[in-house]
């Protein structure tokens, strides 16, 4: 069990977070005998501490579980441990006890676990010499536990650890008996098997019987040993990358196991034949198997006293737990940690069943088992029930959150330098190379593994087989500390007990915190967040259920079979979003996880629909580049958005993990997206496309993201609101995270490792994409995706996962945003603001990147993202300070591709709304964005004037422009812009605002900032009135409400204010707060200006809306409502379209006319957003009354039905929940507050699928975009149809202006994406 101590390190984090960061504080003395030195691990079941025995002065492992835990595993642990005392390979039992707060077991402390040691090997494999000698010891330990009437049921590398003392360092100890079961009755006879038994064990190593939920027998432990030894020698198992328990079970059942013996000694055929012939009742011939090992050793001349591989490598098993653990913390490779995680809590019944069955006479009473109770500790008096709840659920939740935050922080660090760390820790320095073979340093192979994602399956297989696989696995589990699987696994005490240096490492990486919060989340999520990895780790029924529900969701046909990750991610979702640290963590995690979305594209949506009710686990692999994104979700379906948002920044952070990313990043997602976007891709193709785009985008995103990693994380999170896409991405990322968790936790990890490696490559690509996407995709990192940015993002999420990283990001962000707004009001502000930041730079750049500007957006996006930390400050000022020439030139030049103008407009909006984004954007891009914003009023009015005007012409657009001006840096420009071109400027600002709206949070952020009150931001979300700085804001807010809020419904407002104001500014002090402060500083000065500008604009807009733009404004509002999330997209559409070909005058002249079609065109880039905006526009056009109403709503004073609708919805959107539905509903809001809701449902249903299906089509090419929407682009009827759920009109309209729309859609993409997500929901 001392081994457990190491393993417990992680476990402790996993479960410790439940009650508090730690159940026991340092220096706490248990029973006046054991003084806590430090936590070395944690899991769902509890925490493992290294303690000093004050009587013997020796260091021991102290395994603690909260008395309030539903799953009490220590009882079984104690029962089995006591029965095994005196046997070889079993930790010495020192004492146990319980009090009202916790149960504890004290045992001998052990060293590193075998999973960690294998990963520490350069090839991730053990030599035959080490494999055979370990096999002998493990076989002896299995025979020993069987001899006392128990089955271990979770035989895996992380549950075996080497001793840490000179006398025991060459002895292997069995750990973690939390899943054990008594297979004999009191008379010693074999108990009759149950017809159906829950799955127990770890997926990778589980026997076929276990997969079939049959009663496990002695032979099943030997099957696990067989798989273990093959993995030791070969480095991986064929199902390593598959997380789905059912899929792995099918593979194992059909797989010709003799194929596994190719690299094994010929004698192993006897081993295989023998275990294959056994049944539940038959006693295995242990001696026959032992002879196989011995004969193989004789043949090869292997001596019993040869040095083990890690001894040769200098990785000393003697290393103290703490020594070995630190590397694990950073690397997630600690097998023990994995084991701890794997200890995943078994469902209460199962645990109870095990404990009750095993020993009803065994009690954790201090009097019986521990040294005499010292009178000095009455408080520790043993309570009659071990289930006493020491900490109330509330404190537990707080603790979980705390752990989450800590984990996030740790992860963030990991994310930033995980690659390097991994590489360095490996000693091979395999930073970007997919090869996983060189984990030189046993402790830190994990990161490396991550990077060792190998594109070629063989390469992955080899490297992974060597142990790299385990590293990623370890990493992924570690990365997913908050993942339910981890929590669940942690529940099993035995694994926790393993003393794995890896645990400490994992802990260091923050996994412990994650696991702690994960467990909490898992509990709250009913283990929906429990990842398959957890399932692999432990066989809880919940796991199985989750596997099917969440994992299978994640596995659409054609999608990669990495379902486990999804579940893993979910735990983070479960994690409360409110905490800043947590949010950050989520931010970091989300980007990471999303990449997984690729394989889960189709799934993602499906998942989204399913997930909305259940928050995706925050991507636990935040430390991981990929998993990172999934870290912070708030429980709840919309909380997915927080998950997405939180993870995204983390992804950014994991960017450093992106050496590979960089490599993969070579292919810009735009180009890939451009085509793939237009062409509906089969999931596999999409994945391929996404990979390509991921590679390109990652390359530039990598740099950009690396710099912006943290800020991006902070800033990006807000975009998360679009939950729908995220779920898809999440599904994939979750899978990855799950994978990672599993890998981390154990060989499951290895199995996942391959998956992880592949997915890691993909994920890293995706991570890069997402980071770029988060940064840029927020503003539509990918040009092609940008085309379908908002909706494309959503579609992209399925597809984006395949080919549009930025879309994925944007989508995810949007989805996150939408979802966050709906479900996670708290998360949303952060996400919103992050989204904002990301959007402006990314949007500007990325959207322009559609085709021609891809490189520019790349640079801009990279720079933009990079500066996000460094330059979030400049937001407003940067906008103004930026070189106008640059921006104008960019605008002028970029408008060619719809993206640039739209993108810039969107970017500007983001900048204005979210200066952070602008600041974040690289000065090239950022300057452009700022200049763009500043000049946008000028140049945009002129160069993008047509676009801007059109956008503005859309009443929502114009109003948005007003808000934008008042909100962000655009304010100053906005002041003149309205003067020069009330409409044009408005259009430009509108475009910007649209971008803002797209960003949702960004827009709110600026307005929030402008308002200079987070509450105001929320107020904005709630209603236009609250935004005093944006006097026009009410109107604008109304507009935003219809667009932004209408789209997400209740979350629209939430998108902007909640994200930035509540979450972004408050939750993310470093990124959000700084952003907010900057916003406030800039926004305040600009607020007056903004107010003036907005008032002027308002007047102008009202007049214009009343006059020529009445229908358009109506449409725009409706579209805005529909777009809510994709607000930016409608505005973007008009702005970008006009920018391309229409001058301001043209835009104005065609304001009414272009407004409708353009929004649709823009919508096209974002199918959902486009469709919704289109529907809005169409609906608005047919109903001038609606337009007028819309205008009034925009004005806020007149906002009769729409205004009222918007306002009520704004607060909800802001709050969360039905944000998407409401968002969907909102779009029709101008027409009718209620119709929008139903419409949103219909539209969401149709839009989300469409957005996904059209994402590529529409995004890449206008024609495609146009095609999807057959209805006339400017036809009002289609617009209405769309609100009803027919997104085609929007799509078709977008189609013609695919480019402009794409770029503007980039901005819009976010909004649209959110909208699409809402639809998907």
Swiss-Prot record:
GO terms for biological process: learning or memory; negative regulation of gene expression; peptidyl-serine phosphorylation; peptidyl-threonine phosphorylation; peptidyl-tyrosine phosphorylation; positive regulation of astrocyte activation; positive regulation of gene expression; positive regulation of microglial cell activation. Its cofactor is Mg(2+); Mn(2+). Pfam families: Pkinase. One of its GO terms (molecular function) is tau-protein kinase activity. Belongs to the protein kinase superfamily. CK1 Ser/Thr protein kinase family. Divalent metal cations. Mg(2+) or, to a lesser extent, Mn(2+), but not Ca(2+) or Zn(2+). Residues 363-397, 416-677, 714-908, 997-1092, 1104-1321 are annotated as: Disordered. This is Tau-tubulin kinase 1. Residues 637-646, 718-729, 1104-1114, 1234-1251, 1277-1291 have a biased composition (Low complexity). Serine/threonine kinase which is able to phosphorylate TAU on serine, threonine and tyrosine residues. Induces aggregation of TAU. Residues 1310-1321 have a biased composition (Gly residues).
């Amino acid at each position: 069990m001392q081994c457990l101590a190491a393993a417990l390190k992680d476990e402790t984090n996993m479960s410790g977070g439940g009650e508090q960061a730690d159940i026991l504080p340092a220096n706490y003395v248990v029973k006046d005998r054991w003084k806590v030195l430090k936590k070395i691990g944690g899991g769902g079941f509890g925490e493992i501490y290294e303690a000093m025995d004050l009587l013997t002065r020796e260091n021991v492992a102290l395994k603690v579980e909260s008395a309030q835990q539903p799953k009490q595993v220590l009882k079984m642990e104690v029962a089995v441990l006591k029965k095994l005392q005196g046997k070889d390979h079993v930790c010495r039992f020192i004492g146990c006890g319980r009090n009202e707060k916790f149960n504890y077991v004290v045992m001998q402390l052990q060293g590193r676990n075998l999973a960690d040691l294998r990963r520490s090997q350069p090839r991730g494999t053990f030599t035959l010499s080490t494999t055979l000698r370990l096999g002998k010891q493990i076989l002896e330990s299995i025979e020993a536990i069987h001899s006392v009437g128990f089955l271990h049921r979770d035989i895996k590398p992380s549950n075996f650890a080497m001793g840490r003392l000179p006398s025991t360092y060459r002895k292997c100890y069995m750990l973690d008996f939390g899943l054990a079961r008594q297979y004999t009755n009191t008379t010693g006879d074999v108990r009759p098997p149950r017809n159906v038994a829950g799955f127990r064990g770890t997926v990778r190593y589980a026997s076929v019987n276990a997969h079939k939920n049959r009663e496990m027998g002695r032979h099943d432990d030997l099957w696990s040993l067989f798989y273990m030894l093959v993995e030791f020698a070969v480095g991986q198992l064929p199902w390593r990358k598959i997380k789905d328990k059912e899929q792995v079970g099918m593979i194992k059942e059909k797989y010709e196991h003799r194929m596994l013996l190719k690299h094994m000694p010929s004698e192993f055929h006897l081993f295989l034949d023998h275990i294959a012939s056994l049944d539940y009742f038959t006693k295995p011939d242990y001696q026959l198997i032992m002879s196989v090992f011995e004969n193989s050793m004789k043949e090869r001349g292997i001596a019993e006293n040869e040095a083990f591989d890690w001894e040769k490598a200098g990785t000393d098993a003697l290393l103290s737990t703490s020594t070995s653990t630190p590397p694990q913390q950073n690397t997630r490779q600690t097998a023990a940690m994995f084991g701890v995680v794997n200890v995943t809590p078994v469902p209460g019944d199962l645990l109870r069943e095990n404990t009750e069955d095993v020993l009803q006479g065994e009690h954790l009473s201090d009097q019986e088992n521990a040294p005499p109770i010292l009178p000095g500790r009455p408080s520790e008096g043993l309570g009659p029930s071990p289930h006493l709840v020491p900490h109330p659920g509330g404190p537990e939740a707080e603790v979980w959150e705390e752990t989450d935050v800590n984990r996030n922080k740790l992860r963030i660090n990991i994310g930033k330098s995980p690659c390097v760390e991994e590489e360095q820790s490996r000693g091979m320095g395999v930073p970007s190379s997919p090869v996983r073979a060189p984990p030189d340093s046993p402790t830190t192979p994990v990161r490396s593994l991550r990077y060792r994602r190998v594109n070629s399956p063989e390469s992955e297989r080899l490297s992974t087989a060597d142990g790299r696989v385990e590293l990623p696995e370890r990493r992924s589990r570690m990365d997913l500390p908050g993942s339910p699987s981890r929590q669940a696994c942690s529940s099993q005490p035995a694994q926790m007990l393993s003393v794995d240096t890896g645990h400490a490492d994992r802990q260091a990486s923050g996994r412990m915190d994650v696991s702690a919060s994960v467990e909490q989340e898992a509990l709250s999520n009913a283990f929906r967040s429990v990842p398959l990895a957890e399932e692999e780790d432990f066989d809880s029924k919940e796991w199985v259920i989750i596997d099917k529900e969440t994992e299978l969701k994640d596995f659409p046909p054609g999608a990669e079979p990495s379902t486990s990750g999804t579940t893993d991610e979910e735990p983070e979702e479960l994690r409360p979003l409110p905490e800043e640290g947590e949010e950050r963590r989520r931010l970091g995690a989300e980007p990471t996880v999303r990449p997984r979305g690729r394989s889960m594209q189709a799934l993602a949506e499906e998942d989204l629909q399913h997930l909305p009710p259940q928050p995706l686990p925050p991507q636990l692999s935040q430390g991981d580049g990929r998993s990172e994104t999934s870290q912070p979700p708030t429980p709840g379906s919309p909380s997915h958005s927080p998950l997405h948002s939180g993870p995204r920044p983390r992804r950014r952070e994991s960017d450093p993990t992106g050496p590979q990313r960089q490599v993969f990043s070579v292919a810009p997602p735009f180009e890939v997206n451009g085509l793939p976007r237009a062409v509906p891709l089969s999931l596999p193709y999409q994945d391929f496309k996404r990979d390509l785009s991921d590679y390109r985008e990652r390359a530039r995103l990598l740099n950009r993201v690396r710099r912006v990693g943290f800020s991006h994380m902070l800033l990006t999170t807000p975009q998360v609101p679009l939950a729908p896409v995220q779920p898809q991405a999440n599904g994939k990322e979750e899978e990855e995270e799950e994978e990672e968790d599993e890998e981390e936790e154990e060989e499951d990890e290895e199995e996942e490792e391959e998956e992880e490696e592949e997915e890691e490559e993909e994920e890293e690509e995706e991570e890069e994409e997402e980071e770029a996407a988060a940064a840029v995709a927020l503003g539509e990192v990918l040009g092609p995706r940008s085309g379908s940015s908002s909706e494309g993002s959503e579609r992209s999420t399925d597809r984006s996962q395949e080919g549009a990283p930025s879309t994925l990001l944007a989508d995810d962000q949007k989805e996150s945003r939408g979802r966050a707004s709906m479900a996670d009001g708290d998360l949303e502000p952060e996400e919103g603001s992050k989204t904002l930041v990301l959007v402006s730079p990314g949007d500007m750049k990325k959207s322009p990147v559609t085709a021609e500007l891809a490189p520019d957006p790349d640079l801009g996006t990279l720079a933009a993202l990079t500066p996000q930390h460094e330059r979030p400050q400049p937001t407003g000022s940067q906008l103004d300070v930026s070189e106008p020439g640059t921006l104008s030139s960019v605008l002028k030049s970029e408008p060619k591709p719809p993206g640039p103008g739209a993108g810039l407009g969107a970017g500007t909006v983001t900048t204005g709304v979210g200066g952070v984004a602008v600041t974040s954007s690289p000065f090239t891009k950022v300057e452009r964005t700022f200049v763009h914003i500043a000049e946008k009023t000028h140049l945009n009015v002129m160069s993008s004037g047509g676009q801007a005007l059109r956008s503005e012409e859309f009443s929502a657009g114009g109003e948005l422009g007003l808000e934008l001006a008042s909100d962000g840096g655009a304010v100053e420009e906005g002041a003149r812009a309205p003067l020069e071109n009330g409409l044009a400027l408005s259009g430009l600002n509108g475009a910007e605002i649209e971008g803002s709206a797209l960003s949702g949070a960004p827009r709110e952020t600026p307005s929030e900032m402008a308002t200079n009150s987070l509450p105001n931001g929320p107020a904005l979300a709630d209603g236009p009135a609250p935004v005093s700085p944006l006097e026009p804001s009410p109107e604008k807010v109304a507009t935003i409400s219809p667009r932004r809020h209408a789209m997400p419904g209740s979350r629209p407002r939430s998108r902007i204010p909640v994200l930035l104001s509540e979450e972004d500014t408050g939750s993310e002090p470093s990124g959000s707060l700084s952003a907010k402060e900057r916003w406030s500083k800039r926004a305040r000065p600009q607020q007056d200006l903004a107010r003036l500008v907005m008032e002027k604009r308002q007047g102008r807009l009202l007049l214009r809306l009343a006059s020529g733009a009445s229908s358009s404004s109506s449409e725009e509002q409706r579209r805005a409502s529909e777009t809510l999330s994709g607000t930016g997209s409608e505005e973007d559409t008009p702005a970008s379209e006009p920018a391309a070909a229409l001058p301001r005058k043209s835009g104005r002249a065609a304001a009414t006319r272009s407004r409708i079609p353009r929004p649709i065109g823009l919508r096209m880039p974002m199918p959902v957003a486009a469709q919704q905006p289109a529907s809005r526009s169409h609906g608005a056009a047919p109903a001038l009354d609606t337009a007028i109403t819309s205008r009034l709503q925009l004005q806020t004073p007149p906002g009769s039905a729409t205004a009222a609708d918007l306002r009520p919805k704004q607060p909800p959107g802001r709050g969360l929940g039905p944000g998407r539905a409401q968002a969907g509903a909102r779009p029709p809001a101008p027409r009718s507050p209620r119709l929008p809701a139903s419409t949103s449902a219909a539209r969401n249903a149709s839009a989300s699928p469409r957005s996904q299906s059209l994402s590529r089509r529409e995004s890449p090419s206008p024609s495609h975009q146009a095609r999807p929407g057959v209805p006339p682009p400017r036809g009002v009827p289609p617009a209405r149809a769309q609100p009803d759920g027919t997104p085609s009109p929007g799509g078709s309209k977008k189609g013609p202006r695919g480019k402009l729309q794409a770029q503007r859609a980039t901005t819009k993409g976010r909004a649209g994406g959110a909208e699409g997500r809402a639809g998907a929901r």
